[in-house]
């Protein structure tokens, strides 16, 4: 018990195994008390946090590996959601300011980059399936080689936040660029369309960019380009499902009317899909030359 108290005083994360009545005080005091399920006394089992049903110490190592994998998936899940939402929030903020400066209006209302219903679609459908798929991703093979993370370390490290804002800023830039290129009142108009078409083009580009962005976060801290893409397909499959549902929202009349969308020309669909994958480039470059600390 004195040894446990000394380790706790040093700020260590302490786990202890025990099976006897005399182990109960220490099992109760440590962060994680582990009791033997077969040989352990009822008092030790009651005082512990975990019970080894097979009395095999190797099970503890397996539990730590799985726990680290779960924590890493939570980090990726949170960072992925922040990245997509940062891009849309920035685009809405900048787009609203520009619409006010240049008096871009629909009737008496400012012309916004996206509608509330379209943003809701992105949060529930575009990000929903990939975010759930992150929980199914297996831990990296080298997850046990990392040192224990500090208890007071944040969930997202500084480098992770930089990665979030870089990829989110790219999503923002893609949305504003497509809106300007397709709207008849834009600065550098390439395809002269009304605001309905331009907004649909921007909506589709952001959706594809956010889905490709899931690949940026899928195997952090490594790039998906240098690791086994086919090792774990939960996230890619979820992205394909979300992409298919988005196509249905654009080309299926009832959904299209609900979300104020119009059909896109096929060549534009291909073009905007290609633009969406541009979010992969800054993500790869950041991981290649700067790197992300997962702060385990």
List the predicted regions and their residue ranges.
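C-terminal transmembrane module of polytopic membrane proteins
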Residues: 204-296
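Cytosolic catalytic headpiece
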Residues: 1-22, 28-29, 74, 108, ...
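Proline-centered helix-kink/hinge sites
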Residues: 25, 130, 253-254
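Structural signature of FAD isoalloxazine-binding scaffolds in flavoprotein oxidoreductases
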Residues: 26-28, 45-46
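Membrane-embedded transport module
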Residues: 1-15, 35-221
């Amino acid at each position: 018990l004195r040894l446990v108290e000394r380790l706790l005083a040093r700020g260590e994360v302490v786990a202890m195994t025990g099976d006897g009545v005399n182990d109960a005080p220490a099992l109760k005091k440590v962060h994680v008390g582990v009791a033997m399920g077969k040989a352990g006394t009822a008092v030790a089992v009651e005082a512990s946090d975990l019970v080894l049903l097979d009395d095999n110490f190797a099970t503890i190592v397996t539990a730590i590996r799985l726990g680290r994998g779960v924590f890493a998936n939570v980090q990726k899940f949170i960072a992925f959601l922040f990245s997509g939402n940062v891009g849309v929030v920035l685009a809405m903020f900048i787009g609203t300011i520009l619409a006010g400066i240049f008096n871009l209006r629909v009737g008496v209302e400012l012309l916004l980059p996206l509608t509330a219903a379209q943003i809701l679609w992105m949060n529930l459908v575009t990000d929903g399936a990939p975010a759930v798929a992150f929980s199914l991703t297996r831990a990296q093979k080298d997850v046990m080689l990392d040192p224990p993370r500090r208890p007071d370390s944040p969930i997202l490290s500084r480098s992770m936040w930089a990665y979030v804002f870089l990829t989110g800023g790219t999503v923002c830039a893609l949305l504003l660029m497509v809106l300007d290129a397709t709207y008849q009142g834009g600065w550098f108009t390439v395809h002269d369309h009304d605001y309905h078409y331009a907004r649909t083009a921007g909506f589709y580009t952001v959706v594809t960019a956010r889905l490709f962005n899931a690949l940026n976060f899928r195997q952090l801290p490594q790039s998906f380009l240098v690791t086994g893409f086919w090792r774990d397909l939960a996230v890619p499959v979820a992205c394909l499902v979300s992409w298919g549902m988005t196509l249905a929202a654009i080309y299926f009349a009832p959904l299209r009317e609900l979300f104020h969308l119009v059909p896109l020309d096929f060549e534009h669909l291909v073009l905007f899909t290609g633009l969406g994958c541009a979010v992969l480039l800054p993500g790869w470059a950041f991981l290649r030359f700067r790197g992300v600390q997962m702060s385990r």
